[in-house]
Swiss-Prot record:
Subcellular location: Cytoplasm
Protein name: Aminoacyltransferase FemA
Keyword entries, A-Z: Acyltransferase, Cell shape, Cell wall biogenesis/degradation, Cytoplasm, Peptidoglycan synthesis, Transferase
EC numbers, comma separated: 2.3.2.17
GO annotation (BP), single: cell wall organization
Gene transcribed to yield this protein: femA
Record function comment: Catalyzes the incorporation of amino acid(s) into the interchain peptide bridge of peptidoglycan, using aminoacyl-tRNA as amino acid donor.
GO molecular function: aminoacyltransferase activity; nucleotide binding
Annotated PROSITE patterns: FEMABX
Family the entry assigns: Belongs to the FemABX family.
Catalytic activity: beta-D-GlcNAc-(1->4)-Mur2Ac(oyl-L-Ala-D-isoglutaminyl-L-Lys-(N(6)-Gly)-D-Ala-D-Ala)-di-trans,octa-cis-undecaprenyl diphosphate + 2 glycyl-tRNA(Gly) = MurNAc-L-Ala-D-isoglutaminyl-L-Lys-(N(6)-tri-Gly)-D-Ala-D-Ala-diphospho-di-trans,octa-cis-undecaprenyl-GlcNAc + 2 tRNA(Gly) + 2 H(+)
Gene Ontology annotations for the cellular component aspect, listed alphabetically: cytoplasm
């Protein structure tokens, strides 16, 4: 085995074969970092046949003017069941970054620690407890089992829907009542989904602005999304949910015709048997349904007059590799939330994953706080409703490469606080 620099193709070919690689460890992210002017390295291990058997993208930024801080975001990509390979890689990685005047190195492997449900109850251990002792023996310090959202540390909890051996109907059956109801609702309410082009990304950004204002969270800059769309190429999809009013109004009119037939039948039943309570109740219920239907028709006609035949209502930003669909971000028009466009977006992408044989549908980060007072309690409830599971990852590890200067660096940081 030998530690070596990799070409972009070698790196991409390998990471696309590994079933547990994160989108930050793919060629598109390397191209993005290079375009942004970030010092970037592609390194890995090759076996005696010159085949890549481990890889990672490393970035480096200046610290204390003359040193560098190296980071492998969700790396390395490696078979963590091969303990000998893991030991060799991390040992060689330290030697490599030392040659580039590294002050300290951070890694946060895309490696599950344990599995939980959305009540926070542990349902299983991933079998990777040994990694903590292994990395400690190599001089890496674990940063702890933190919860919540941190500007430096990667989120440690993901909400993931396992799609292995499941049909779309299976997924629908396993949803809770609200998710199931809204998914069926958008299917019959004229809500359509298409993918946005690069030029149309401002539509997505407008929804993100609406959502960030309503839910009071700080969103990324426009450039974050635009640059990833550009450099990740086909690995980013931005589905847009919109209403086609011609189709929606036609569906509502068809629904009204059925309701009118049922209503007339109820009237005839009452005429035949005035004491028939069941027929009277049915008549009242149908009157309510007809009233609601007419309100929807009126709303649809008014909105069509205001916006034209198509009205965008929700969009999402998804990042894809051969083994995972990641729901990175999404936003909805506050004014038209009642059309449940976000459910159409999720349903479209769940079906995309199933059709492309992708077994992991990642709703992405949650805080790890499963209490009702959690800052993301509503988000947790939404993701739980799809019958997703929670994966807790091992977390961050730091290795000081130049120990004396690293200690000075930490002291200076504390003084600045």
């Amino acid at each position: 085995m030998k530690f070596a620099n990799l070409t972009a193709k070698e790196f991409s070919d390998f990471t696309d074969r590994m079933t547990y690689s994160h989108f930050t460890q793919m060629e598109g992210n390397y191209e993005l970092k290079v375009a942004e002017g970030t010092e970037s390295h592609l390194v890995g291990i090759k076996n005696n046949d010159n085949e890549v058997i481990a890889a990672c993208l490393l970035t480096a930024v200046p610290v204390m003017k003359i040193f560098k801080y190296f980071y492998s975001n969700r790396g390395p990509v490696i078979d963590y069941n091969n303990k000998e390979l893991v030991h060799f890689f991390f040992n060689e990685l330290s030697k490599y970054v030392k040659k580039y005047n590294c002050l300290y190195l951070r890694v946060d492997p895309y490696l599950p620690y344990q599995y939980l449900n959305h009540e926070g109850e542990i349902t299983g251990n991933a079998g990777h407890d040994w990694i903590f002792d292994e990395l400690e023996s190599l001089g890496y310090k674990h940063e702890g089992f933190h919860k919540g959202f941190d500007p430096v540390l990667q989120i440690r909890y993901h909400s993931v829907l396992n799609l292995a051996n499941k049909s779309a109907n299976d997924v629908l059956k396993n949803m809770d009542g609200l998710r199931k109801r809204n998914t069926k609702k958008v299917k019959k309410n004229g809500v359509k989904v298409r993918f946005l082009s690069e030029e149309e990304l401002p539509i997505f950004r407008s929804f993100m602005e609406d959502t960030s204002e309503t839910k009071d969270f700080a969103d990324r800059e426009d450039s974050f999304y635009y640059n990833r769309f550009k450099h990740y190429k086909g690995r980013v999809l931005v589905p847009l949910a919109y209403i086609n009013f011609d189709e929606y109004i036609e569906e509502l009119n068809n629904e009204r015709n059925v309701l009118n037939k049922d209503y007339n039948k109820a009237l005839k039943d009452i005429e035949k048997r005035p004491e028939n309570k069941k027929a009277h109740n049915k008549k009242e219920n149908l009157e309510q349904q007809l009233d609601a239907n007419q309100q929807k028709i009126n709303e649809a006609k008014n909105l069509k007059q205001e916006h034209g035949n198509e009205l965008p209502i929700s969009a999402g930003f998804f990042i894809i590799n051969p083994f995972e669909v990641v729901y990175y971000a999404g936003g909805t028009s506050n004014r038209y939330r009642h059309f449940a466009g976000s459910y159409a977006v999720q349903w479209k992408m769940i079906n995309y994953a199933i059709e492309h044989g992708i077994n992991r549908y990642n709703f992405y980060g949650i805080s790890g706080d499963f209490s009702e007072d959690a800052e993301d309690a509503g988000v947790v409830k939404f993701k739980k409703g799809y019958d997703a599971d929670v994966i807790e990852y091992v977390g961050d590890f730091i290795k000081p490469i130049n120990k004396p200067m690293y200690n000075i660096y930490r002291t200076l940081k504390k003084l600045k606080k």
